[in-house]
UniProtKB/Swiss-Prot annotation:
It is found in: Cytoplasm. Its EC number is 6.1.1.21. Keywords: Aminoacyl-tRNA synthetase, ATP-binding, Cytoplasm, Ligase, Nucleotide-binding, Protein biosynthesis. This is Histidine--tRNA ligase. One of its GO terms (molecular function) is histidine-tRNA ligase activity. It catalyses: tRNA(His) + L-histidine + ATP = L-histidyl-tRNA(His) + AMP + diphosphate + H(+). PROSITE patterns: AA_TRNA_LIGASE_II. It comes from Burkholderia ambifaria (strain MC40-6). The keyword Aminoacyl-tRNA synthetase applies. One of its GO terms (biological process) is histidyl-tRNA aminoacylation. Homodimer.
Amino acid sequence: MTEQKRKIEKLTGVKGMNDILPQDAGLWEFFEATVKSLLRAYGYQNIRTPIVEHTQLFTRGIGEVTDIVEKEMYSFTDALNGENLTMRPENTAAVVRASIEHNMLYDGPKRLWYIGPMFRHERPQRGRYRQFHQVGVEALGFAGPDADAEIIMMCQRLWDDLGLTGIKLEINSLGLAEERAAHRVELIKYLEQFADVLDEDAKRRLYTNPLRVLDTKNPALQEIAQNAPKLIDFLGDESRAHFEGLQRLLLANNIPFKINPRLVRGLDYYNLTVFEWVTDKLGAQGTVAAGGRYDPLIEQLGGKPTAACGWAMGIERILELLKEEDLAPEQEGVDVYVVHQGETAREQAFIAAERLRDTGLDVIFHCSADGAPASFKSQMKRADASGAAFAVIFGEEEVANGTVGVKALRGAGEEGEKNVQQTVPVESLTEFLINAMVASAEDGDD
């Protein structure tokens, strides 16, 4: 009696942590190339920080009574040395930590950018994931409203470069610490009048972080939040001048905006300017980029008092918008797919593929899936499916004659017709392909 083979359980990914598959990676690469070009144009330098940081960095930097710290962080104790560690839920605190640790500001301000995965333990839904990706900028050592305006302008320029429309800018000022303290007293007094109707979340925040009550999504509390004392009415001359300076620069650059007095952001390190870029095309998760000024943070994390501002944007949400507006670029295929029939032809084809790559062409060499030689027909099907512009064909007869077959798979070859096979001397193959591709590109431009 034969023993029945035990079925091996199929493993799946963690919910809310998504694979980026080859058919989607092209869109990611398009976005990354676009944003990196923009960041270079503004003189920003790339910084890369670890995914795991000491938990204290976030409790001290973000704030202990924020949603992120209270219930969204992936934290654990390192079994090796007992350290409390956290997978980064955002990256501003880490960039600031790195700038202090490596004394990066000793010779003046820095413009930095980052890109990578962040992690938050929350219920996955459209536009909100447990592992998500952000690109962000941090302008360290710049105190004026011109720095705020510049980082906002960068976002507008990115939307234009990507072709995105309908993303609207909302701004507010959180003022200085003493202004927020005065407003906090009046806000708590106001909210206490409605203690019996506040939801559990608002009651929890009432005495710890009452500003966040203004940001409630509960429809039953909207009128209460709308009529609450406004922080902007508590701003002193310095804060007002900064906010008005920002507005003048935005207007001078034709950047429309709305002042939203309920815009407070969910991180404790902000002061003065805060802003969000929002859209109504993504349902509840309408914020695609957000940021502001965080002048106290560098000193709070052990550095010298230094002004700073920045933003972060959710890449998944922006890619969703690109798909929604049908702006995703077509996937580009390789330049050449090399097929072959016969052992001698296979060896010559392998050598030729490497020589073509030496010239900068993108080349796929047909490798056997099961170790057995594939038929010419099946190889040509693979060539067509690969998206290659040309198939280069090595057969025993061609090799004996010192020639190779070339077939245009996408556009016109030198003869002007797709799928017309031409015979080319091996030594002229590279020149022929380059000329044919130039001609095809020019035809596409017409």
